[in-house]
Amino acid sequence: GQRQRVAFARALAPNPELLLLDEPFAAIDAKVRQELRSWLREMITRVGITSIFVTHDQDEAIEVADEIIITNHGHIEQAGTPIEIYSQPKTPFVTEFMGSPTRISNITSFHGYEELGEGLHAVVRPEHVSVTKKTEQSRFSSSVEEGVVERVMFRGREVELHVRVHDVLLVANRRLEEASITEGERVNVFIYQVFAFPAGENGTQNVNIVENANIETEKLFYI
């Protein structure tokens, strides 16, 4: 990481009006790269130079940038703050580019999404999927799907679960302190939210955020 710091200092020496950084952390291990991202963000803010940071790493873009521009084959798909880009994607490309999404072509077969209609694709992210053991109490017990865990991966503070539901392999995260789930186990799955768009279209304003229709009903029942 020291070489990158020196190169950055040299680039700042002439006091440029604009700084271009093209994949500056591409050949660095993960921990050093994370440290350099924080350091670079602090330095750019302190010096006050407008910077263009080119990267294929979504985490780098989200952490370092004030504004992100996502391009696809030379076309600008969306521009906005990191929160806007991540939480309100405007095109199918952006929806599937950010996070760790799963595309679902048969979303109407899932509880709470039956009314969406045919001809829609949906994208779901791990943070919008709840996986619980059969023995655990769930607020949405009447709306869950049954799934089978195909893979469990340790991720430090949490585990990543790959769960097969309706021939779709969903990805979800579960806190490490929660009861362990094993491969091959049958579990309950609930999808809180999806990003939906017409199949085969790639317009600029055709992605809708759709919440599970059973959430409000289950909340009233639970209270």
What function would you assign to each model-found segment?
Residues 1-91:
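ABC ATPase nucleotide-binding domains
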Residues 31, 97, 135-136:
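Residue-level signal for well-ordered alpha-helical positions
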Residues 80-84, 96, 117:
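Short, surface-exposed loop/turn motifs that are enriched in glycine and acidic residues
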Residues 112-223:
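Non-catalytic connector elements of ABC transporters
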Residues 87-113, 121-123, 190:
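C-terminal boundary and immediately downstream tail of ABC-type ATPase nucleotide-binding domains
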